[in-house]
């Protein structure tokens, strides 16, 4: 599979050969399993103090007194039981609970290959909601000069030349204040995902690109399903550098 390579000014540079990974069968079931595995691996186990709600001298006087057999303090107030103020929790969370949903290594690689192939399908990219009318090619590959960019304005200018600025603007317009209690827990804004930039490794473009709305930057060796199919929704608009494509070809 041959695709065009573009310079940063939007002109054609030449062609490059893609490996068979970009033509992998679409497996949404594997993609979802791999995403859930990566997502749950980040969850932190939590539990309660084993003595929470039990630090009291309250006791029950037993039956035959015409009142509930609730454990009571010396003043007659209920304590210890879950329905009492300051009592223990009923079925509290436990640190022993297994949160991480594991997946086999071959399944994870198959899921990643399937997600990469989905990002090279223009119809799936459209269905995910990305703005691709001005994008010259999907998958979109740019010369390695992109990795030397040091300024965000230079990255944005390159995005404009390659027709990616429309999707960045879509993500910027879609930033909303989250409904619910999550806004009090460090998740105030709901931010849509826009362009994923895949580079060959550590470079100046990583810092220069990540400040754009919805844009993520990742090296080819660290690329995972969470990056190219966030929310287990495959078909993310992706910008590859030439060296990144070579690294992916080696990886698969």
UniProtKB/Swiss-Prot annotation:
One Pfam entry name? Ribosomal_L4
The record's Gene Ontology biological-process terms are:
translation
GO CC entries: ribonucleoprotein complex; ribosome
PROSITE patterns to which the protein is assigned, alphabetical: RIBOSOMAL_L1E (PS00939)
Q: One GO molecular-function annotation for this sequence?
A: structural constituent of ribosome
Q: Is this entry keyworded rRNA-binding?
A: yes
Q: Which UniProt keywords apply?
A: Ribonucleoprotein, Ribosomal protein, RNA-binding, rRNA-binding
Coiled-coil residue windows: none
Which superkingdom heads the taxonomic lineage of this protein's source?
Archaea
Which NCBIfam families does this entry report, sorted A to Z? Answer: rpl4p_arch
The family line of this record is: Belongs to the universal ribosomal protein uL4 family.
Question: Any idea what job this protein has?
Answer: One of the primary rRNA binding proteins, this protein initially binds near the 5'-end of the 23S rRNA. It is important during the early stages of 50S assembly. It makes multiple contacts with different domains of the 23S rRNA in the assembled 50S subunit and ribosome. Forms part of the polypeptide exit tunnel.
PANTHER family recorded: 60S RIBOSOMAL PROTEIN L4
User: How is the subunit organization of this protein annotated in UniProt?
Assistant: Part of the 50S ribosomal subunit.
The record, for HAMAP family, names:
Ribosomal_uL4_A
Instruction: Write down what this protein is called.
Output: Large ribosomal subunit protein uL4
